[in-house]
Amino acid sequence: MNVAETPFEFFTVAYLTRIGNQSAGNLEDLLAGLEQCSDASIFHHTFQTLSSHHFLTEGFSNDFAQWALAEANRDALAEQFAALDIRDYTSIAALRADLCRVLRDFIAAFPQFSRQEALDRFYFCESLEVTMPFSLNAGTLDEFRNGVATISHASFHFHFVTSRLRLQLRTNDFSHWLAGSLGLTTLAENIDRIDIYTNTLDSARAKMLRLVDRERRKYEHDSNPRQDSAG
């Protein structure tokens, strides 16, 4: 089994949530907030809330869509916000631009709703990320499997979801390392196809482990070919 020159380093992560100074009582306010809030706020209400959504049974996976639905009573806008797939974004700037575009277009199409007061205000919050190296590295596929099975939900989310922003690539930490360091391109691609919206963190991890186990069995089979019986 291949040994990576650069081991995979698992990180543990925690998020500190801070309520900002901005809030929105209608769609015009929300647009101003989206244009002016910090990158940490956009991250909190999209990438970070997806982690919490994995433990819920209903509602949208980003806060802007959920507020548009539940508080502003604008179902069509909520669906347009929710249609923005965070897997398509490698920068907060690009995600912010599309959030603003969706809202501007909606306000232009339905100006009568732009200043209609919502049932409750939207409060812009920020997620401050604190990371520390986990006491576990992986140089082989076996060690990698052990690490993935061991890390917390927050760590799994950090490596599998939010890593796109850090790498500025449309992939995740796990797939990036498997392809680049172990040469397991097919495994990396299959892992990256795991849907972060239809799976919980637990089911996404379980699917990943099954894919890794299948790769390990394939390696064991190729390393121990059936020997012909002596005649």
Language model feature labels by segment:
Residues 1-231:
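Terminal, compositionally biased segments used for targeting/anchoring and flexible tails
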